[in-house]
Amino acid sequence: MARFFIYLAYNGTRYSGWQTQPNAPSVQQTVEEAISTIVRQPVGVVGAGRTDAGVHAHEMVAHADLPCDTPAEAATLTERLNKLLPRDIVIYRMAPVKADAHARFDAISRTYHYYLTEQKDPFMEGLMLKTYRKLDFERMNEAAALLPRYIDFTSFSKLHTDVKTNNCRITEARWMPLAQTGQWVFSITADRFLRNMVRAIVGTLFHVGTGKLSITDFRDIIESQDRSRAGSSAPAHALYLERVVYPSDLFL
């Protein structure tokens, strides 16, 4: 058995999230069952994070111990898995890593994207958020620029979770226009994220964009460490795990 990082993508619409849940379909369980079926033995996979119900991933990374001795065998397994997995999950590749490499704990950064459209587009339904409000993206970026100055993001954390700390180091947070007129993406990168954190930040930035909150209000919300003062969470269907980065010395 050798350890591999599995690079995959999924449309999260049909799933209760990444993590296995009782009596609800999850991406983790679907992938584990597919691998176990092909290799004819139980195989567990551990993801880089736990995306919520309805959240998508352009790049999720998971580790698993697999009966593959060579990259060619891993490539063959990848091909067989993609034939077995449902259409809303794809495995791009498998990379051999050190025996103790951990997809979650060894990640040095994660990037999420939140997609927004100002124009109704039936082909983006369930993949982007259609906004019916006029948003000031310059003001929203002014507020987002405050985020890397702080570490404690209790104000944007789901309440009553089992995490030991609400500290995160954000290195980038900004809205960018896409090539398609009227479409925007919010990109945020950090060493780690709290449960529901990105959606809470986006929902609060919407209030800045409509003028309901000032830049000072946004700063005060961060400093208050009070979730009740922040905005409601933005819908899950427009959020994507975009990229996970690891130290190069993990790979063989």
UniProtKB/Swiss-Prot annotation:
One of its GO terms (molecular function) is tRNA pseudouridine(38-40) synthase activity. Its EC number is 5.4.99.12. This is tRNA pseudouridine synthase A. Substrate binds at residue 112. It holds the Pfam family PseudoU_synth_1. Formation of pseudouridine at positions 38, 39 and 40 in the anticodon stem and loop of transfer RNAs. It comes from Porphyromonas gingivalis (strain ATCC 33277 / DSM 20709 / CIP 103683 / JCM 12257 / NCTC 11834 / 2561). Keywords: Isomerase, tRNA processing. Homodimer. The gene is truA. Gene3D superfamilies: Pseudouridine synthase I, catalytic domain, C-terminal subdomain, Pseudouridine synthase I, catalytic domain, N-terminal subdomain. The active site is at residue 52. NCBIfam families: hisT_truA. Belongs to the tRNA pseudouridine synthase TruA family. It catalyses: uridine(38/39/40) in tRNA = pseudouridine(38/39/40) in tRNA. GO terms for biological process: tRNA pseudouridine synthesis. The keyword tRNA processing applies. It is an enzyme of class 5 (isomerase).
